[in-house]
């Protein structure tokens, strides 16, 4: 099969796709998640925040948009005293950015892969507090809706849901996959990237179906 013609079906059934994604996350690997063509129509590369490595961060920076985001629950953002980036969110998709962050210690300019990993580690440490972070910085936290993908079908919520289901703390790192010319990767290109790098691929809708199958309609996500 030519890679340009790859579709989600190439990666198995919806259930199998989520299974493979969770297995990768449990092993400290990454996943690719696409949303609906009528929404952002983008694919995000996602890693667990607790275990992300410098090579994984370098991969995000090299192949993605450069806007590295840390997806968090509301409890995390309150614990870290992270206010929303704006009081009135007029973003079309209601993407919930907080003010950006940097680790208070152990970083230089905050831009390198190592510095961004240090910032994420500072934010998600078990004893993390507002004093561990500087504001603004080069990592962009996103606040997930409490109901996850059952409340909002976004990459932020998909990331937090996947981490929880994989047994990680509900926090993950994402960045949007881009092409060499700087344009956004769509499903065929995301699928080809997944095959080339042996990364599982699933969709937000796959995760919605998985959660419905678990009878989780009323289960909120918490830290």
Swiss-Prot record:
Family (UniProt): Belongs to the DHBP synthase family.
The reaction(s) this protein catalyses: D-ribulose 5-phosphate = (2S)-2-hydroxy-3-oxobutyl phosphate + formate + H(+)
Keywords per UniProt: Lyase, Magnesium, Manganese, Metal-binding, Riboflavin biosynthesis
Enzyme kind, highest EC tier: lyase
GO CC aspect terms: cytosol
Pfam families: DHBP_synthase
Complex and partners: Homodimer.
Record pathway: Cofactor biosynthesis; riboflavin biosynthesis; 2-hydroxy-3-oxobutyl phosphate from D-ribulose 5-phosphate: step 1/1
Organism name: Desulfovibrio desulfuricans (strain ATCC 27774 / DSM 6949 / MB)
Residues holding Mg(2+) 2: 40, 155
Required cofactor names: Mg(2+); Mn(2+)
GO MF term set: 3,4-dihydroxy-2-butanone-4-phosphate synthase activity; magnesium ion binding; manganese ion binding
Binding of D-ribulose 5-phosphate, residues: 39-40, 44, 152-156, 176
Protein name (database record): 3,4-dihydroxy-2-butanone 4-phosphate synthase
Function: Catalyzes the conversion of D-ribulose 5-phosphate to formate and 3,4-dihydroxy-2-butanone 4-phosphate.
InterPro entries assigned: DHBP_synth_RibB-like_a/b_dom, DHBP_synthase_RibB
Site (Essential for catalytic activity): 138, 176
Cofactor: how bound: Binds 2 divalent metal cations per subunit. Magnesium or manganese.
GO biological processes: riboflavin biosynthetic process
């Amino acid at each position: 099969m030519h890679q340009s013609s790859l579709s989600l079906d190439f990666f198995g059934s919806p259930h199998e796709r989520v299974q493979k994604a969770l297995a990768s996350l449990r092993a400290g690997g990454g996943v690719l998640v696409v949303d609906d063509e009528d929404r952002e129509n983008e694919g995000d590369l996602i890693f667990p925040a607790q275990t992300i490595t410098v090579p994984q961060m370098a991969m995000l920076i090299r192949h993605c948009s450069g806007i590295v985001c840390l997806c968090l629950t509301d409890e995390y953002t309150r614990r870290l005293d992270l206010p929303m980036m704006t009081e009135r969110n007029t973003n079309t998709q209601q993407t919930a950015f907080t003010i950006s962050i940097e680790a208070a210690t152990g970083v230089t300019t905050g831009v390198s892969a190592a510095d961004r990993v240090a910032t994420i580690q500072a934010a998600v440490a078990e004893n993390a507090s507002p004093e561990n972070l500087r504001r603004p910085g080069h990592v962009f936290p996103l606040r997930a809706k409490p109901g996850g993908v059952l409340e909002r079908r976004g990459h932020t919520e998909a990331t937090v849901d996947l981490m929880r289901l994989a047994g990680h703390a509900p926090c993950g790192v994402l960045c949007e996959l881009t092409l060499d010319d700087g344009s956004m990767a769509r499903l065929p290109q995301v699928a080809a990237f997944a095959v080339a790098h042996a990364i599982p691929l699933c969709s937000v809708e796959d995760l919605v179906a998985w959660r419905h199958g678990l009878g989780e309609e009323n289960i909120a996500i918490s830290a």
